[in-house]
């Protein structure tokens, strides 16, 4: 056996690390069979403002996931802890502590960054070392946008969300878990993106903590919106196999649609996907018809119910389609009115099996079915619509069949949505 002076070993690994940084390899990805790079395992948790809905939270996941990717690329051995779903503003049933595996394929998520469920985190980590409560600067952005952060006094409503019950013991919502607490709590004013959050975690005294929870994670923006790493994170968010099976059975039974005929089959491993625009979709029109609170916030941008019926009739005639899949939050009486205005000329289908599935699972099935339609039309500035457009980009539809919106009666040729095309 040969022995080497410790100085040579240090130099050897320093050169390997330098090489990794210069060649787009990273310490986190060094082949553990060849090199021994000791990196302490760390956990990043996060939460989002209560008022944010399911689809905005999916977007925040991508921001935080790219923070973890960036941390790992810089040599930090971070694992992302997935925040349990529940108590969401738009959900009819106030369920809590729902795991991600009910909605998404965890194996697919782990192909982008390492993730674990909160329950699995609790099995070996309790309490949380540090809660960082993100907030905007009280004085605003100023005359220019500068990426920055600093510890500040807490602004409302931070202090109503977390209470110190004794030294090194802070209580908060923590996804409804009663027996979870944090040793430390700190408010941080931040102005920036995923990269700014990475700098906060890496280049401050927070770096000494092994488990950090970032609350109000929606405060940070995407560092590279619409670029390669954005789409890698998005492509990793495959839906759970159980939900896909339910949706596929529905589209085959009612919509004459399947992957082979529609040319919508995806490879099992998203990292092996190739650019394409060959998807045809099922012989039906997919529509996301946003109602309820949008009638107050976006009334000028929405068609009336008769206006919606006319749009659907005109589109189906133009596209030679007889079936419509309707994803909507509209009350039943509004759906009935819409169907009546279609005069039985078109078949309207909805997924309504609410007994076995929760609100979030039904939302995903709605999106999946709209994403597999030959043509899709959505609602103005709706994150639900955005997620469908992203799904269709991943599946590989022609752009003209995806980026379409319902126009108000007063502006039938309204401006159509921005075309955020997939990047590989």
Swiss-Prot record:
Q: What is its main location?
A: endoplasmic reticulum
- Pathway where it operates: Protein modification; protein glycosylation
Per the UniProt entry, the disulfide pairs are 154-187, 407-414
| InterPro entries (UniProt xref) | GDP-Fuc_O-FucTrfase, OFUT2-like
State which tissues express it.
Expressed in the anterior part of embryos, in the hypodermal and neuronal cells of the head. Expressed at different levels in a variety of cell types after hatching, including neuronal, hypodermal, muscle, intestinal, and somatic gonadal cells. Expressed in the nerve ring around the pharynx, in dorsal and ventral nerve cords, intestine, and a variety of hypodermal cells of L1-L3 larvae. Expressed in gonadal sheath cells, spermatheca, and tissues surrounding the vulva of adult hermaphrodites, and in the body wall muscle and hypodermal cells of adults of both sexes.
Q: Which UniProt keywords apply?
A: Carbohydrate metabolism, Disulfide bond, Endoplasmic reticulum, Fucose metabolism, Glycoprotein, Glycosyltransferase, Golgi apparatus, Signal, Transferase
Name the domain of life this protein comes from.
Answer: Eukaryota
Task: Give compartment(s).
Answer: Endoplasmic reticulum; Golgi apparatus
Active-site positions on this chain: 52
UniProt-recorded Gene Ontology molecular function terms = peptide-O-fucosyltransferase activity
Role:
Catalyzes the reaction that attaches fucose through an O-glycosidic linkage to a conserved serine or threonine residue in the consensus sequence C1-X-X-S/T-C2 of thrombospondin type I repeats (TSRs) where C1 and C2 are the first and second cysteines of the repeat, respectively. O-fucosylates members of several protein families including the ADAMTS superfamily and the thrombospondin (TSP) and spondin families.
The record's similarity note reads: Belongs to the glycosyltransferase 68 family.
Q: What is this protein called?
A: GDP-fucose protein O-fucosyltransferase 2
* Source species: Caenorhabditis elegans
Q: Could you read off the lineage of the organism from its UniProt record?
A: Eukaryota, Metazoa, Ecdysozoa, Nematoda, Chromadorea
């Amino acid at each position: 056996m040969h022995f080497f002076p410790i100085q040579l070993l240090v130099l050897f690994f320093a050169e390997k690390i330098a090489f990794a940084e210069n060649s787009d390899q990273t310490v986190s990805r060094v082949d553990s069979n060849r090199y021994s790079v000791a990196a302490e395992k760390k956990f990043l948790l996060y939460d989002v403002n209560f008022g944010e809905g399911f689809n905005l939270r999916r977007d925040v996941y991508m921001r935080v996931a790219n923070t973890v990717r960036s941390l790992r690329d810089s040599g930090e051995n971070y694992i992302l802890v997935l925040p349990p779903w529940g108590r969401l503003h738009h959900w009819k049933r106030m369920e809590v502590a729902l795991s991600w595996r009910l909605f998404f394929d965890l194996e697919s998520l782990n192909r982008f960054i390492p993730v674990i469920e909160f329950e699995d985190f609790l099995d070996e980590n309790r309490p949380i070392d540090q809660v960082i409560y993100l907030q905007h600067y009280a004085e605003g952005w100023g005359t220019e946008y500068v990426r920055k952060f600093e510890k500040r006094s807490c602004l409302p409503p931070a202090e109503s969300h977390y209470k110190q019950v004794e030294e090194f013991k802070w209580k908060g919502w923590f996804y409804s878990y009663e027996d979870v607490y944090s040793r430390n709590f700190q408010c941080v004013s931040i102005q920036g993106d995923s990269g700014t959050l990475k700098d906060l975690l890496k280049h401050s005294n927070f770096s000494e903590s092994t488990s950090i929870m970032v609350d109000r994670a929606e405060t940070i923006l995407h560092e590279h919106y619409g670029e390669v790493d954005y789409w890698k994170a998005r492509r990793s968010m495959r839906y759970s196999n159980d939900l896909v099976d339910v949706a596929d059975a529905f589209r085959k039974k009612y919509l004459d649609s399947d992957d082979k005929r529609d040319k919508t089959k995806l490879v099992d491993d998203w990292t092996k996907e190739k650019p394409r625009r060959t998807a045809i979709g099922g012989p039906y029109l997919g529509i996301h018809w946003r109602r309820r609170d949008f009638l107050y916030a976006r009334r000028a941008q929405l068609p009336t119910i008769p206006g919606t019926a006319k749009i659907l009739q005109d589109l189906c005639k133009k596209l030679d389609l007889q079936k419509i899949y309707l994803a909507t939050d509209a009350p039943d009486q509004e759906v009935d009115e819409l169907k009546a205005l279609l005069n039985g000329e078109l078949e309207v289908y909805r997924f309504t099996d609410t007994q076995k599935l929760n609100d979030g699972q039904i939302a995903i099935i709605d999106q999946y079915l709209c994403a597999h339609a030959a043509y899709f039309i959505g609602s103005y500035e709706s994150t639900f619509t955005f997620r469908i457009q992203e799904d269709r980009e991943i599946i590989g539809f022609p752009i003209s069949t995806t980026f379409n919106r319902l126009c108000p009666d007063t502006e039938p040729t309204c401006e159509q949505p921005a075309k955020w095309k997939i990047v590989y």
